[in-house]
């Protein structure tokens, strides 16, 4: 009797790694998760030890097998999804990283980004990569490592060093150094990849003095890249056949295959992506243009809005302010609030993302009175997530000319019913919460399974991740717009506060 076959998704995130095994119905059969340490060398810097990431991945692969009694020989293919932009540079011969991985959130390379802007490269980089110049992306992180590790530039020029985002690093490790590749979606987040020509861009590489030999080969999101070395996959030589950055994997897992479909993942941050089809649309309002996925020889472009603080605002209530003991408790407290929504929290702890891109802004609170309670404060913090999403959705509609009718949602904070209802109200559209909230891992599994024929085609996937719950807008138009105007005033005041500080510094 033949054994049942499965797909394994490796979901390598910002704070933890997970391995999830899916069956042919797209159901989770087994999973394992392991956190790893965050490294904060200085204020605003965030780093990871790339070997600790690899160790955590090895651990969760084993954990998923142990929990389910599934054998490595039963895994038909592996899909990888990952925290994007996070940058690793390692020795080609030994496989040892020459510096910690610099994480997407880290601001240590902001001076390099600022210099690129001052030198007048904003338009050129935007037109080629679809991105704004920011420390968020990989390019300045590579430059920083080559500048700060003695001898690194020279070694890179000799072809002794390799660069990769986390997908590349994991494939390199799983194949024991046999394969150095990335995929369209991750390459599109480096600020080095020309998303129109689908090539590493020589002009940008020259500008940043980054040797092309360091860079991985760019592949589609669904094809066989290589096989695991048996000793790295508990005896199994299994095809690695799907890869996508976490937010693009979620777009695919949400089955947002048609132009105009939009998904939002409420994680640490909140990332809203709209499928714009086979045409690259440049934003004139600070959205990012990126590659959603490339499959069967066809690239699908996307517009993306990045919100830096979403779920982490709830963690701040729990860990920083000690207002709640668990994240789910925020919903009960918010529902108990009797305020008239006059309190606004602007959680700009690491600046503001789309559409403001103001890295100097810092968190602020407005509208407090003597009667403001803990419940009111918690509700305002949850509402801040929804207001930020409205900022992005409004911008997307202007840029794309598409009237968005529905937002597909997933991620941890999407479980908060109060937040989802307020999100529907403040947007005035339907919110469709996925039945299977593991959409990021599911997207990676779908991409891997398609490449090896585990699922026949994209139509076969459409039954596998239905809507779990629909939230419909119920707030009247005048109240909705009054609340949103208050939010816009709060954001403006937040920006003015730090601008005044910058002006004071300049005057000294």
Swiss-Prot record:
Record-listed Phosphohistidine modification sites: 232
Sequence positions that bind ATP: 14-16, 268, 311, 315, 412
Residues where sn-glycerol 3-phosphate binds: 14, 84-85, 136, 246
The EC number(s) this enzyme carries: 2.7.1.30
Molecular functions (GO terms): ATP binding; glycerol kinase activity
Pathway: Polyol metabolism; glycerol degradation via glycerol kinase pathway; sn-glycerol 3-phosphate from glycerol: step 1/1
Keyword field: ATP-binding, Glycerol metabolism, Kinase, Nucleotide-binding, Phosphoprotein, Transferase
List of residues binding ADP: 14, 18, 268, 311, 412, 416
Keyword Phosphoprotein: yes
Listed Pfam families: FGGY_C (PF02782), FGGY_N (PF00370)
Post-translation changes: The phosphoenolpyruvate-dependent sugar phosphotransferase system (PTS), including enzyme I, and histidine-containing protein (HPr) are required for the phosphorylation, which leads to the activation of the enzyme.
Activity regulation description: Activated by phosphorylation and inhibited by fructose 1,6-bisphosphate (FBP).
Biological process per Gene Ontology, one example term: glycerol metabolic process
Reactions performed catalytically: glycerol + ATP = sn-glycerol 3-phosphate + ADP + H(+)
Binding site for glycerol: 84-85, 136, 246-247
Ranges in coiled-coil conformation: none
The keyword Transferase is annotated on this UniProt entry: yes
Tree of life domain: Bacteria
Subunit structure: Homotetramer and homodimer (in equilibrium).
Main function: Key enzyme in the regulation of glycerol uptake and metabolism. Catalyzes the phosphorylation of glycerol to yield sn-glycerol 3-phosphate.
Family: Belongs to the FGGY kinase family.
Protein's recorded name: Glycerol kinase
Gene from which the chain derives: glpK
């Amino acid at each position: 009797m033949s054994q049942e076959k499965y797909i394994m998704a490796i979901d390598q995130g910002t704070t933890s790694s997970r391995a999830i095994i899916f069956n042919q119905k797209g159901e989770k059969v087994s999973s394992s998760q392991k956190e790893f340490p965050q490294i904060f060398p200085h204020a605003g810097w965030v780093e990871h030890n790339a070997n600790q990431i690899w160790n955590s991945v090895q651990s969760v692969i084993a954990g998923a097998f142990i929990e389910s009694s599934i054998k490595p020989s039963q895994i038909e293919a592996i899909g990888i999804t990952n925290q994007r932009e996070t940058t690793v540079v390692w020795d080609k011969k030994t496989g040892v990283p020459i510096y910690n991985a610099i994480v997407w959130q880290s601001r240590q390379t902001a001076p390099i980004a600022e210099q690129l802007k001052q030198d007048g490269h904003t338009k050129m980089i935007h037109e080629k990569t679809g991105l704004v110049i920011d420390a968020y992306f990989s390019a300045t992180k590579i430059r920083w490592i080559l500048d700060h590790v003695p001898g690194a530039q020279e070694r890179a020029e000799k072809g002794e060093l390799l660069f990769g985002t986390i997908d590349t690093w994991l494939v390199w490790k799983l194949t024991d150094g046999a394969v150095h590749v990335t995929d369209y979606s991750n390459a599109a987040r480096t600020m080095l990849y020309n998303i129109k020509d689908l090539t590493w861009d020589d002009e940008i590489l020259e500008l940043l003095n980054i040797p092309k030999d360091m860079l991985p080969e760019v592949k589609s999101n669904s094809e066989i890249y290589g096989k695991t070395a048996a000793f790295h996959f508990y005896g199994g030589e299994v095809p690695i056949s799907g890869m996508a950055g976490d937010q693009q994997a979620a777009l695919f897992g949400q089955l947002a295959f048609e132009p105009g479909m939009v998904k939002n993942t409420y994680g640490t941050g909140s990332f809203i992506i709209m499928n714009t089809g086979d045409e690259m649309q440049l934003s004139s309002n600070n959205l990012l243009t990126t590659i959603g996925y490339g499959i069967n020889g066809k690239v699908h472009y996307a517009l993306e809005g990045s919100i830096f603080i979403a779920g982490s605002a709830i963690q701040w209530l729990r860990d920083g302010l000690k207002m709640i003991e668990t994240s789910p408790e925020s919903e009960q407290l918010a529902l108990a609030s009797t305020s008239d929504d006059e309190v606004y929290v602007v959680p700009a702890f690491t600046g503001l993302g789309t559409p403001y891109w103001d890295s100097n802004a810092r968190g602020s609170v407005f509208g407090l009175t003597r009667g403001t309670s803990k419940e009111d404060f918690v509700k305002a913090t949850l509402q801040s997530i929804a207001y930020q999403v409205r900022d992005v959705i409004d911008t997307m509609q202007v840029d794309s000319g598409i009237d968005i009718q529905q937002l597909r949602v997933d991620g941890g904070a999407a479980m908060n019913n109060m937040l989802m209802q307020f999100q529907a109200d403040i947007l005035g559209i339907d919110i469709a919460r996925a039945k299977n909230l593991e959409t990021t891992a599911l997207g990676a599994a779908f991409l891997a399974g398609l490449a090896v024929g585990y699922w026949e085609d994209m139509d076969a996937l459409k039954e596998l991740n239905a809507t779990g719950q629909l939230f419909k807008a119920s707030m009247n138009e005048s109240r909705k717009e009054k609340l949103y105007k208050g939010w816009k005033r709060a954001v403006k005041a937040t920006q003015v506060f730090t601008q005044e500080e910058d002006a004071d510094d300049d005057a000294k």
